[in-house]
Amino acid sequence: MCIRDRYFLERLAEEYGLAIEYHPKPLGATDWNGSGMHANFSNTTLRTCGSKETYEAICEAFRPVVNDHIAVYGAYNDQRLTGDHETQSITEFSYGVSDRGASIRIPIITVENGYKGWLEDRRPASNGDPYKIAGRIIKTVKSAKV
């Protein structure tokens, strides 16, 4: 959800006397997935490379900077990223094809298209700042040795 969407949602809620809750686990430690703001991203390389090795190199670029990402991915994300409910643990990093429990998911359609497509970072929380999240992802992707 972009900033503009949040603005409209807030104004609509205001008009009806409601409030929006962006907490990633608004019901506390319940047995449900919580609320994330998964970030789908690509660049020219991801859309055209056709190389599993390139995708793996980009994913591996995230491994040493996990804490830098978590720092901007939203408050209380530790309550959502438990390793349960289709999430990886906040202290772990993984990636995989169509793996909804990974930190970064490589969509199956990307693989079916010959490794031409995008990646999905499943760690950002619903209350994260999309600009900070995008900035951190861009910095990491640009640092990848491909």
Residue ranges and their predicted role:
Residues 1-3:
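Short, small-residue-biased leader/transition segments that mark boundaries at the very start
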Residues 5-8, 12, 58:
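Short, hydrophobic/aromatic alpha-helical segments in well-folded domains
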Residues 12, 61, 65, 137-144:
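Conserved short hydrophobic interaction patches
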Residues 14-127:
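Loop-rich catalytic cores of soluble enzymes, especially ATP-dependent carboxylate-amine ligases
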Residues 126-146:
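An acidic, glycine-/histidine-flanked metal-binding catalytic module
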